[in-house]
Design a protein with these regions (language model features):
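Extracytoplasmic low-complexity, Pro/Thr/Ser/Ala/Gly-rich segments
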Residues: 1-53, 96-106, 176-188, 279-289
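Short amphipathic alpha-helices in soluble, non-transmembrane regions
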Residues: 15, 54-65, 103-105, 134-146, ...
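Short edge beta-strands and adjacent turn/loop segments
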Residues: 19-43, 111-122, 187-211
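Acidic helix-start/capping segments at beta-turn-to-alpha-helix junctions
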Residues: 30-38, 73-88, 159, 245-252
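Surface-exposed beta-loop interaction hotspot
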Residues: 79-196
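Intrinsically disordered, low-complexity segments enriched in Gly and acidic/Ser/Thr residues
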Residues: 170-255
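Hydrophilic extracytoplasmic domains
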Residues: 237-289
Length: 289
């Protein structure tokens, strides 16, 4: 068994090392007593590979490795560098060749790390002081046409985090996320999080979540919440806005939610005693300036 295992391991390494696009390969097999052997394969492509080279390795090489090992499944990671962007593709995944091809098309210089995984494609951007224009991926992007994988974007803007979670068929580009970030008062930006979700897990609504930190509940005021809410009043895409306030010593944040329809807030918020003053402040002419 050990000799046969070593022979298969050597064949896999020889095959991968012989591919033109491959810079290096590492193959490991972990014997299991009562389960099939576990195979892990790390493949590093040559820098700046073409889309065709990436697709060939992700699709054809994985199938060949399965055949050579005789295993039902192999955990394989294909990595490469495009410009200054590091890309990691974790196999197996559904429609791996399509996911890899679409990801290569979506790469841009501002991206630092990209991961293609079983359920999602995540784009992590380099820290900057201002959110780039046209940051939100448009529906025309190839990765958003896949449908089988979630697509997420994340970036650190100064001291605030911004996350975008997409869904097939949902266009988020009209949501003024950049303006919302810029309206957060400077004393509330440290650790603040602004998340835009095309579909939340429960109600499948387009939702904006703003989370800020305060030292004590006594420091809570409506200014930051009202500023963020004001930027999205009138937006036709958002169906809900949630404003969260956390105190470092407390586990559960306080949440004020607003349902929206056709750009207008429905009711006074939930709970209304917290939502009403925020909404009133957000509706002032200079609320988002």
């Amino acid at each position: 068994m050990a000799m046969a295992r070593k022979r298969r391991e050597r064949k896999v390494h020889q095959y991968l090392s012989g591919l033109d696009a491959v810079a290096s390969a590492r193959v490991e097999v972990h014997p299991e007593f009562s389960e099939p052997d576990r195979w892990t394969v790390d493949v590093r492509l040559k820098d700046d590979p073409s889309k065709g080279s990436v697709v060939t390795v992700v699709r054809d090489a994985y199938a060949k490795v399965l055949n050579l090992t005789g295993a039902n499944e192999v955990r394989m990671v294909v990595t490469w560098v495009k410009g200054k962007t590091f890309v990691f593709c974790y196999l197996p995944i559904k429609d791996a060749d399509k996911a890899a091809s679409a990801t290569v098309e979506a790469l841009s210089p501002g991206m630092e790390r990209v991961q293609i995984e079983e359920e999602r494609i995540s784009f992590e951007y380099r820290t900057t002081e201002t959110l780039p224009d046209h940051f939100i991926l448009p529906p025309s992007s190839a990765v958003l046409r896949l449908g089988s994988l979630r697509v997420e974007q994340s970036i650190l803007i100064g001291r605030s985090h911004c996350f975008i979670s997409h869904a097939k068929g949902k266009d988020l580009t009209s949501v003024p996320i950049k303006r919302a970030l810029e309206t957060i008062p400077s004393d509330k930006r440290y650790g603040a999080v602004l998340s835009l979700e095309a579909e939340d897990y429960n109600s499948h609504q387009a939702r904006l979540i703003f989370k800020k930190w305060v030292n004590d509940w006594q420091d809570e005021d409506v200014q930051a919440d009202a500023a963020v809410l004001a930027t999205v009043l009138g937006n036709q895409v958002l169906q809900r806005v949630e404003l969260l306030t956390s105190v470092e010593s407390k586990v559960q944040p306080r949440v004020v939610g607003f349902d929206m329809k056709s750009g207008t807030v429905v009711g006074q918020g939930d709970p209304p005693e917290k939502g009403a003053p925020i909404l009133a402040a957000a509706q002032q002419p200079d609320a988002s300036s």
